Amino acid sequence: MEQLAKLLLWQLLLQQSSVVYLYSVPADASNPDSVVVSVLNISATRGSQAVLPCKSYRMVWTQDRLNDRQRVVHWDVYSTYYGDNKMERLCDMYSAGNQRVYSSYNQGRILMPQNAFTDGNFSLVIKDVAESDAGVYSCNLHHHYCHLYETVKIQLDITKKAKAAKEYWDGEKAVIVALEGSTVMLPCVNRNHIWTERHSEEEQQVVHWDRQPPGVPHDRADRLIDLYASGERRSYGPLFIRQKMNITDTAFALGDFSLRISELENADEGTYSCHLHHHYCGLHERRIYQVFVTEPVREKKVVNLTTHNTAPAIDPNVVRGHNVINVIIPESRIHFFQQLGYVLATLLLFVVLLIIVVFITRKRRQRGYEYNVKKYGEKDVNLKEFTVDTTDLTQYKSEDIRLDYKNNILKEKAEQARSFPAKNIDLDKDFRKEYCK
């Protein structure tokens, strides 16, 4: 009975786990060392289409029709023996072809192992070394398909003494001191699987898209799509998610693995990640995208819909509403500032006109005051009322004023001043003359 109960319990647990992971496929954690190369924030309006860019030309897959001529090794030497100080290509070899020696002098003197791309040993053998062979040699490995380039440098010195022959490391490169006339081997060994064996590349290239809802950690992200270079595609989740999130069929041909999300909704917010795995080339990259959904901006318009005059006759048995529909939407800020500018300009013009009117009024009032003063002097002042009393002058005339003068001229002038002849002065006549002028 206990064993039967345990079996039933295990069956229930298995059923629960299958139900839980039916719509939530966890992300692949087999490559925790994926390098995060970019983090982007993407905002899109609700109802639109969002494109999460994920491109890598190192992931472009092309069928190798040249028997894998994309791997090559070549040896170069930098020599100062002839004083020209130049780099010279010695030999090269493709993974599917024979090695090629560039100089006729080196034919039969230098060579690499024929099984170099199988064994991973790319060492260069030089027979009957001479002083002209001294220099800095470089072993260059190129993988054009994976965009990998590796270089190993070795310095070769020639000596005529057997005791001086040795090998050591100078901190940057290996140094070999070889006896003149002997055979020397410059080591270059790389047994990485990229250089030694050929994999089925389309089975080792895969792209994953994962999604993390807000608050969900990376290790519990949901898998959306798996896409292999062979053309196999796996989509996860409900049908509506598989229909709205997709990658183009030419992804591996163009290196464009961008995810397109159609008809965005608020539930589509979260963290998306694009995982690029090229196991053959050792490429493991991850790109992260923070997706935010915003509300669309509505255009503000004023729409007036009116019916035409040629409407059919109104049926009295049918209750109808109004024929005019007015839809008023708040105006934009630009229109508000335009109206405000018109109002301010009108007020400014009114103030200028008011200032001009006040100035003219004050001028007219000043002219009126001057006119009243002249008129008042003409009407109210009667010069006849003023009389000149000359009785007092006779007193000064009769008086005998004796003054001491320095000469006769001053005395005569003083006597003339004391004599005031009687004269009648008509003041009214003189004032009238002045006024008429």
From Swiss-Prot:
Q: Which residues lie on this side of the membrane: Extracellular?
A: 23-339
Q: What is its main location?
A: membrane
Concerning Gene3D superfamilies, the annotation shows: Immunoglobulins
| Record topological domains on the Cytoplasmic side | 361-437
Q: How does it sit in the membrane?
A: Single-pass type I membrane protein
Keyword list (alphabetical) reads: Cell adhesion, Cell membrane, Disulfide bond, Glycoprotein, Immunoglobulin domain, Membrane, Repeat, Signal, Transmembrane, Transmembrane helix
Attached carbohydrates are found at 41, 121, 246, 304
Q: Per the record, GO CC terms?
A: cell surface; plasma membrane
Disulfide bond sites: 54-139, 188-274
Q: Which GO terms describe its biological process?
A: cell adhesion; cell differentiation
Q: Where is the Ig-like V-type domain?
A: 32-159, 167-294
- Give the UniProt subcellular location, in the record's own words: Cell membrane
Which spans are transmembrane here?
Answer: 340-360
What is the annotated signal peptide range for this record?
1-22
Any Pfam family: V-set
Fetch the PANTHER family from UniProt. Answer: MATRIX REMODELING-ASSOCIATED PROTEIN 8 (PTHR44793:SF1)
Q: What does this protein do?
A: Transmembrane protein which can modulate activity of various signaling pathways, probably via binding to integrin ITGAV:ITGB3. Mediates heterophilic cell-cell interactions in vitro.
Quaternary structure and interacting proteins, as annotated: Homodimer in cis. Does not appear to form trans-homodimers.
* Name the UniProt record assigns to this protein: Matrix remodeling-associated protein 8
Q: In which organism is this protein found?
A: Gallus gallus (Chicken)
